[in-house]
Design a protein with these regions (language model features):
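Rossmann-like dinucleotide-binding cores of NAD(P)H-dependent redox enzymes
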Residues: 159, 172-222, 346-350
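FAD-binding core/adjacent interface of flavoenzyme oxidoreductases
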Residues: 2-9, 66-159, 233-240, 248-253, ...
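C-terminal catalytic lobe of FAD-dependent flavoproteins
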Residues: 242-271, 357-437
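Beta1-alpha1 glycine-rich phosphate/pyrophosphate-binding loop at the start
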Residues: 2-73, 175-197, 406
Length: 437
């Protein structure tokens, strides 16, 4: 077995950012990075936004001006973790007679046959696309290999069905339609983006997708493959089901966090299916209210408990980019027997590009909150999510780049009270809406 101070399991954005944030924070010990793919770490948003126009991988080191091979002590490519085991504390390790290096607290075995002992393990294992078991003929879009297969199926104009009207589904729909393909979207909820924005505002986003057929409140109950066509069975809310065949069918049903490693821990109660790994605001894994020392989770596999925003759900690029700063600081503080420093965390931020349209969401939209919309044009508006006493919890910005900086500043310290009378006034800058500095 081999010792490493920090073992980072997963080499997506959150994983490599953890490596670099540790170095930036002054960590001088060894860092091992396990990359489950053969390809160097790459960016995922371009897979849906630029599938046909950018076939090459957008490597994160190039895109973010990083040098991960220099920052990590060891990188193991095409290597996944198999088991995670807690190591009992060395009985002779005391404050007066510490071991020669940080005491290993976790042991990880891998598909490459290695056995790593680590003082800290960071789970950045990501997530995989959800696909019902019987849908073998359906494409997904989560990895470079997924993108390559889908691109190969779309070399000529095709009729494409996209099952799922979340961010990835509508980004892909707009992109493919712009490149000559005929698109049909099936969504089980009443509108596109209903889970993310609420039905009213998801319906408004749908107006940005002209010439795309959209079936909402419609469940796909069966998918079969017949020669070079794929047939779906659709069940609307009322009336009989129907069938339709397509050249290509893509499932955009969300993602399931990779939490398998926790099943090998006797301390960890089984997580509900599809649930992310629970962590506190510094990324420390927390099971049944108890922090597991030296075990951390970040990125698409984890949900963090934030004191201002509540549970920060996974799946957002900006969260994977920024959260490792707090995690690295917590690791450094732990090694120095100190409390993590108070590091400001930006408001949660989701961004999307739907064809020519740019969308930003700052904060956490609550569907039971009041919404007020400031309209600039038919394709440009800002929606504010707030309580009855004008506590602002989220801002949705559609095609209004001048408002993004203001929204970021407005929510920089968490939900804030605003002047509700000025929300619809297009002449009032967003940054001036706060009523309680």
């Amino acid at each position: 077995m081999t010792f490493t101070d920090v073992l980072v399991v997963g080499a997506g954005l959150a994983g490599i950012r953890t490596v670099h944030c540790l170095r930036d924070a002054g960590h001088t010990g060894s860092i091992t990075l396990l990359n489950g793919e053969n390809t160097p770490p790459y960016d995922r948003p371009p897979l849906s936004k630029d599938l046909l126009t950018h076939p090459e991988a957008v490597l994160l080191d190039e895109d973010l001006a990083l040098n991960t091979p220099a920052a990590a002590t060891t990188i193991a490519h095409n290597t996944r973790a198999l088991t995670l085991t807690a190591i009992p504390v060395h009985p002779q390790a005391t404050a007066h007679h510490p071991p020669p290096h940080p005491e290993p607290r976790w042991q990880v075995t891998t598909t490459g046959g290695e056995c790593w002992d680590a003082h800290h393990v960071v789970l950045a294992t990501g997530a995989s696309a959800i696909t019902p078991p019987a849908w073998e003929s359906v494409a997904t879009l989560r990895t470079l290999d997924d993108a390559a297969r889908l691109r190969a199926a779309l070399t000529t104009p095709a009729h494409v069905a996209i099952i799922g009207g979340g961010w990835i589904g509508i980004e892909l729909a707009a992109h493919l339609h712009a490149h000559g393909h005929t698109i049909t979207i099936y969504e089980a909820a009443p509108t596109l983006l209903a889970a993310q924005l609420g039905a009213e505002h998801g319906a408004r986003i749908s107006t940005l997708l002209p010439n795309i057929t959209i079936h909402t409140s419609t469940v796909i109950t069966n998918v079969t493959h017949d020669h070079d066509r794929t047939r779906v069975t659709a069940q609307p809310p009322h009336g009989p089901s129907w069938q339709a065949s397509y050249d290509v069918v893509v499932a955009a049903l969300g993602a399931t966090p990779h939490t398998e490693l926790l099943t090998t821990l006797p301390e960890a109660a089984p997580l509900p299916p599809g649930s992310p790994i629970p962590a506190n605001n510094n990324g420390q894994v927390t099971i049944n209210g108890q922090v597991l020392p030296g075990l951390h989770a970040v990125g698409d596999c984890a949900t963090w408990a934030d004191p201002h925003w509540g549970a920060i759900t996974p799946g957002h690029w900006m969260t994977a980019l920024t959260a490792p700063t707090l995690l690295a600081a917590a690791i450094i503080a732990s090694d120095n027997n100190e409390q993590p420093p108070p590091i400001p965390r930006p408001a949660p931020h989701t961004f999307s590009r739907i064809g020519p349209h740019h969308i930003d969401v700052f904060g956490v939209p609550h569907q039971d909150h009041t919404t007020t919309t400031r309209v600039y044009s038919a394709t440009s508006w800002v929606t504010f999510y707030h309580t009855d006493d004008a506590l602002l919890t989220a801002v949705l910005i559609v095609n209004s780049p001048r408002d993004t900086a203001g929204a970021r500043k407005l929510l920089a310290h968490g939900p804030t009270h605003v002047n509700s009378a000025s929300l619809t006034d297009t002449t009032v800058p967003l940054k001036t809406l706060r009523t309680h500095p």
